């Protein structure tokens, strides 16, 4: 900070960094320098200054008294800081690497029953890019023993958590490189022995949480919906009761945010100044716990990079205070500083008390209504008749329970593929699990060998693959058909609709599908499929409500077994002349008491008005 020379002379002559080890009968500052020196592994008094990169942070004795401080102004010229060195200020620093177990204790902690526990830190390099739920479920699915991750968090690009026994750590070690991510890269898992995690050592007791809640209530202004937690650790009531609340500790920040969520989720303003915060990882959940927050004061802390703000950029802040953090020194001028902060908080109106120009908003707040989906598109009546006839035959066989009859529908060199949406959670627990192993979602699948293997070649392999898929019943009334390309030797069309599974674990589950066929003319004046792409997803609530509103008839090789020979002959003739299938032709004849002339007149009248559904022509 620009004013660092002054703050050093006023406060830092008493500064001491120390690990937060709780001992009975000792206050938080009664710690032996010699003991810490041995544990740090660096003898002598000339110990190198270093940030304690742990949850309890770099804690100064001066925190107990809120002395004067020169306010940092990012809009003025910054003096050179290089003249201020640690040895000029008579400060004593101790570095403790807590994830390295001290020789005399190993990675052991002590359980409540007095037995010894070995703790291990699990590190996943580049784990920050993975969703927590997906990552843990994938590790659990490959791990031979169940485990409970303690203190899962992200540290820079890494994901980390702790486990409390050697057998679990050994099982997790065996998972190393066994998991493929969505880009088909193997995930590394590193195991190190460790001291007990801070949430175990520094967990606030229930009675301490209640006291913290009481103190926060005293600091809350209901009329402004504002909570002032400035210099919380040095609060006189907390100090008097020997409750050490350090917001750099994950457990303390979690307890604070939980109190906010449970008691004042409508919070508009939060002051966290002068709490020596050097990272905001543990604050990320504030986006959900206080979604209405508009004003946030982080001044007088120790944030080094504006990237820390990425962890809370989901907040719709209008006012932010950052002065007094070293991150302000990293910008060459005022406009760069404002741009970097506004990139995270585009609705920001005030920064460090300065009014900002109104934000340029490109987002449209007003709700937009999507145009309604149109019906099928066939181009010509001849193509319509050809495609609907093909689909009627195809899905009658597909839903029959034996799909071997589809062999005649495919070309000898046909190919087929299936894809489903990417499943971030454990695929084995997804309702689409039966489709997952065959999914060729090229947006996520990068391995060319696997891409090729999941593409089914030749009609025998295609039909064998289709036979392995769950048995289905399609709602033909839901079909929307679009012809997208047509030449004299090729036809490309897609079908959208819904179906339900009729057996297995997902019986009666409703799915939506899109299927794209590329076909060539067949010898029987029909179509022969050369390419078949099937996309399956879970049906939406609207699709579920509309599905099977008119029950589709069960496919049968003899659709009119109860008719007399004369009626069957009339039915065949009417179906041929009208172009309708047997089911709808029979309905038309029955509605007109099997009077052929009246039925023909009714058909002509209804067709002219466009009141006959397309499904009536699917044969």
Curated annotation (Swiss-Prot):
GO molecular function per UniProt: mRNA binding; RNA binding
One Gene Ontology biological process: protein transport
Compositionally biased residues, Basic residues: 20-29
PROSITE patterns for this protein: LRR (PS51450), NTF2_DOMAIN (PS50177), TAP_C (PS51281)
Keywords: Acetylation, Cytoplasm, Host-virus interaction, Leucine-rich repeat, Methylation, mRNA transport, Nitration, Nuclear pore complex, Nucleus, Phosphoprotein, Protein transport, Repeat, RNA-binding, Translocation, Transport
Post-translational modification N-acetylalanine, affected residues: 2
Highest taxon of source: Eukaryota
Outcome, altering residue 521 to Q: 35% reduction in mRNA export activity
Residues recorded with modification Asymmetric dimethylarginine: 42
Effect ascribed to mutating residue 82 to A: Greatly reduces RNA binding and no effect on interaction with ALYREF/THOC4
Residue numbers spanned by region Interaction with ALYREF/THOC4 and LUZP4: 2-198
InterPro entries: Leu-rich_rpt, LRR_dom_sf, NTF2-like_dom_sf, NTF2_dom, Nuclear_transport_factor_2_euk, Nucleotide-bd_a/b_plait_sf, NXF_fam, RBD_domain_sf
Pfam families, A to Z: LRR_NXF1-5 (PF24048), NXF_NTF2 (PF22602), Tap-RNA_bind (PF09162), TAP_C (PF03943)
Expression by tissue: Expressed ubiquitously.
Effect annotated for changing residue 105 to A: Greatly reduces RNA binding and no effect on interaction with ALYREF/THOC4
UniProt entry tagged with the keyword Protein transport: yes
Family: Belongs to the NXF family.
Domain notes: The minimal CTE binding domain consists of an RNP-type RNA binding domain (RBD) and leucine-rich repeats. The nucleoporin binding domain consists of a NTF2 domain (also called NTF2-like domain) and a TAP-C domain (also called UBA-like domain). It has 2 nucleoporin-FG-repeats binding sites (one in the NTF2 and the other in the TAP-C domain) which contribute to nucleoporin association and act synergistically to export cellular mRNAs.
Protein name stated in the entry: Nuclear RNA export factor 1
Species in which this protein is naturally found: Homo sapiens
